[in-house]
């Protein structure tokens, strides 16, 4: 008979063993009395030795037969977590670290008060900025503008000449325009879009939907598909800055502008473009 689980953590692993192990260890070190469960999903990136290590570290280790991307990979882990019928499922990036001992207690208190479907924590980054609440695109006009921008970036990244001009533009922009102080994420908010790198689903949410994340995307903009679901089904999404998690990446990227980087950026933008085009299609279907 399976023990009663208060919270299940789903961690999606892809190649970076150090981050994944630090993420798991941060959960294990937390001083809370509630029973918890850790599910690690490998997106078809582990060697046999790495898989063995993750099997030992996690409570459940699920190995995908191919790289499923963000949404499908996490949904695979969530399906495993559902077997334990936890009160909450926390889906967190493998490059996040939890250091807050009352993390689970805070989630429980928020649920008792708000009966949320999804909860987003304050996501602390190296740059000091909070990426929650997430500024999701909410209109077709915004999505169309983002599609045009994505196409432009793909064109720039494929041209050495355009890449050089982009570097000059960015450097001048940083010299001439001082960055504004970031104000996002200071106050508790309801009915907001939440960042996908750390999101807590309640039991009532994951029982309502077969797939917690929309299955159609590979990478990027999963938040907008959650936002469509939130508005359509009038779900309760809340953001609590008193609940905290550290995200190693954040938005403070140190660009080195080499050819390998641009291959990665092209891959990134191509997947962003696919997600945005799909989002636009769903918005049009909703209108019609």
Name each region found by the language model.
Residues 40-50, 66, 93:
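A conserved acidic beta->alpha catalytic loop
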Residues 64-81:
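Glycine-rich, basic loop-to-helix element that forms the pyrophosphate-binding segment
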Residues 86-97:
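Short beta-strand-to-loop acidic/aromatic patch adjacent to the donor-nucleotide binding site
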Residues 100-134, 139:
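Conserved donor NDP-sugar-binding/catalytic core segment of glycosyltransferases
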Residues 16-30:
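Short, well-formed alpha-helical segments that are part of the catalytic scaffolds
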Residues 159-167, 181-201:
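A recurrent flexible, glycine/aromatic-enriched loop bordering the glycosyltransferase active site
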Residues 192-243:
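A short, conserved alpha-helix in the catalytic core of glycosyltransferases
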């Amino acid at each position: 008979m399976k023990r009663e689980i208060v919270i299940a953590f789903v961690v999606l692993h892809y190649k970076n063993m150090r981050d994944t192990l630090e993420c798991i260890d941060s959960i294990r070190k937390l001083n809370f009395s509630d029973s918890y469960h850790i599910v690690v999903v490998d997106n078809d990136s582990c060697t046999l030795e790495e898989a063995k290590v993750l099997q030992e570290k996690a409570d459940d280790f699920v190995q995908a037969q191919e790289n499923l991307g963000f949404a499908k990979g996490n949904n695979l882990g969530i399906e495993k977590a559902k077997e334990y019928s936890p009160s909450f499922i926390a889906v967190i990036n493998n490059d996040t670290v939890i250091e807050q001992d009352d993390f689970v207690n805070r989630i429980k208190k928020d649920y008792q008060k708000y009966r949320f479907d999804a909860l987003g924590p304050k996501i602390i980054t190296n740059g000091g900025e909070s990426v929650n609440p997430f500024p999701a695109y909410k209109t077709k006009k915004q999505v169309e503008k983002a599609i045009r921008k994505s196409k432009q970036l793909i064109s720039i990244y494929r041209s050495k000449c355009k890449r050089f001009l982009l570097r000059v533009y960015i450097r001048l922009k940083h010299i001439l325009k001082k960055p504004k102080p970031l104000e996002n994420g200071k106050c508790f908010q309801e009915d907001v879009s939440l960042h996908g790198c750390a999101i807590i689903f309640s039991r009532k949410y994951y029982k309502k939907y077969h797939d917690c994340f929309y299955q159609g995307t590979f990478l990027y903009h999963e938040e907008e598909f959650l936002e469509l679901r939130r508005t359509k089904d009038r779900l309760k999404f809340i953001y609590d800055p008193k609940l905290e998690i550290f995200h190693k990446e954040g938005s403070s990227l140190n660009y080195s502008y080499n050819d390998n980087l641009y291959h990665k950026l092209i891959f990134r933008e191509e997947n962003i473009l696919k997600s945005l085009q799909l989002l636009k299609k769903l918005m049009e279907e909703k209108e019609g």
